[in-house]
Amino acid sequence: MFQKFDIIVVGAGHAGCEAARSSALMGAETLLITQNLNAIAQLSCNPAMGGVAKGQIVREIDALGGMSGIITDQNTMQFRMLNRSKGPAMWSPRAQVDNVSFGISWRQHLETISHLQLWQDEVVDLIINNGTVEGVVTKIGLNLQVDLSATIQ
């Protein structure tokens, strides 16, 4: 049913989406497993991207070619620069985004990427051989293998 994958990413939160996207764009056959395909990149009850700490991370991901900042811009309802009363080194961007459209935008983007497959399931165990993770076992009983001989350019 499934081929062997070069990379299996477990979890489609913000980091999982960025990791799966990056590996697929590098040509690695990538599988992104999530518990709910309708909750990809789901934000918390406070749907903010940015702030003092996360704002710096979003900027760094953007500088490395990531999509979190771009998808945030596409779904922003309000933007504010925090700490304006302090010096410019302390300023921090924060965007309030539409929680539903943000996740939909991420999913639509991921679905356009070659070498990337999305799968709804839950990982319940790892396949380990001589201390090396070789795949995952899912809740519905699939054994999904990683191709350890793959070379990614």
What feature does the model see in each segment?
Residues 21-132:
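Conserved N-terminal/central alpha/beta ligand/cofactor-binding core
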Residues 2-15:
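Beta1/beta-strand and adjacent pyrophosphate-binding region of the FAD-binding site
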Residues 127-147:
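Conserved beta-strand-loop-beta-strand element in the redox core of flavoprotein oxidoreductases
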Residues 3-5, 140-153:
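Core beta-strand elements of the Rossmann-like FAD/NAD(P) dinucleotide-binding domain
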Residues 8-9, 31-32, 137:
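Structured core elements
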